[in-house]
Amino acid sequence: SFNSDGTMDETLNVQRADTRNSGLFGHYNLGWDYDIDKRNTLAASVRFGVRNNHTFQDDLTTERYLNNTLTGSTLAGNENKGAFNNVDASFNYTHYYDKPQREFSFQSMFSRNTGNSMFENFLLDPVDGTTLNRFLNDNDSYNQEVTFQVDYQTPIGTTQIVEFGGKTIMRSVFSDFASYQAIGEGPYEPSAAAGFNNNLNYDQNIAAGYLAYTLALKNGYSIKAGSRFEHTVISAYTLTEDNIDIPAYSIVVPSLNVSKRLKNNNTIKASYNRC
């Protein structure tokens, strides 16, 4: 804005704070492979990860100036904590038949991410530093996925291969957050503000199957045609809404691949997929 003498008001905001942070990060991996015999193999792996962090912002002072004159100030602080871990595990089995290129495999995978995050804000009296009010938010959550897959392939003669298999995926997502308020150093009470307390429970189950056929021609061409079918069912609800209506759906995904083997072991490919 302009003053009566035509000059413009000058506003200035100044912030300063002391900050601290600490954290822990780590990953651990374990793998195992075992050949039962020349026809049967096992493989397993486990991966564990952890990520923790803790930060503070002390004496967050905000000063507002108008034309170099202090017009107001606030004093605040906050604390943030997060603890997260994840586990990924897999187990695979493969059986090789006496006939070349004929094999059966089973795969399973498990993945889970778990976390807790919390932040707390303090509003302090800028004169004596006493606590005026506090706000706390706490959130527990996890994501989980379990997968099972079976595959089988077998040759027909020396120029054809048939493949088929099935797969199921089970996903779960959960989040539960709650907010609390307190006056001064008094006890926390649940926040009555809309949208500050809720949870989400979400489950998704997918069943899929596929069939593919490969034909190798004498002129160096190879043709692979197939199709995949998926059916998905979803259920979800929250603290404020029961049985959210999410329709189940199915899709069919055809595919076609044509390749030509060239000299010097080079290959040219063309493919088509419809999503």
Place the predicted regions along the sequence by residue:
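Primarily recognizes Gram-negative and organellar outer-membrane beta-barrels
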Residues: S1-C275
